[in-house]
Amino acid sequence: CWSLVGSEMCIRDSLYTKHDFVNKLSNDTLKEEKFLHYLTQDYLFLIQFSKAWALAILKSDNLEEMKIAASTVNDLINFEMELHISLCANYGISKSDLENADEENQNIAYTRYVLELGYSGDLLDLLSSLAPCVLGYGEIGINYKNSNPKTHMYQKWIQTYSSNEYQDVCKNVANLIDKAFILRLGDDFVGTYKWQKVNKIFNKSTLLEIDFWNMAMK
């Protein structure tokens, strides 16, 4: 984990960060149609996820929080989503095809859960729901950095999340989370009632991440 809060609320669930989908991708045994289905759904996911991060700007209490949230929105829209577009284009799947695809139920369940927290909760609620995706993919990048699948798009995917650029995104988000919790709850945030609530949110989002992988394997 990258942070103080992260060490308390860390991604330890191997059902997520070492899911069979990622294992198969890393050793070149994942069927390409499953990966393309995942990319399509993840593209739709990132559209909603970007909106949720935009809500983090609204929920922020200071300029530093706003800057990190805004930077994350930029990374999602202008870099991560572009990766999906470029990988899919190699297989004849256009940007229009991606945008007009139907969302799977697991995708809807996850993104709407996060957005609802963004609308109804405070920044800590929202960040706790967003953290498993950002930090989990960072952990996946570290775990599989040295794997070397022959399939180009699998290679490219692993390189993206293991890259210094993405790891820096994780560090910035972790720093945002740390400071946001300490600002609002104090140094002893683990002992607060709020901590119990946000842990439940974090764990729920982690389970929804696992469901997303399971959907991709169908």
Which residues does each predicted region cover?
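Active-site-proximal alpha-helical scaffolds that flank and shape metal-associated catalytic sites
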Residues: 66-172, 203, 207
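Acidic, carboxylate-rich catalytic segments that either coordinate divalent cations
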Residues: 192, 196-218
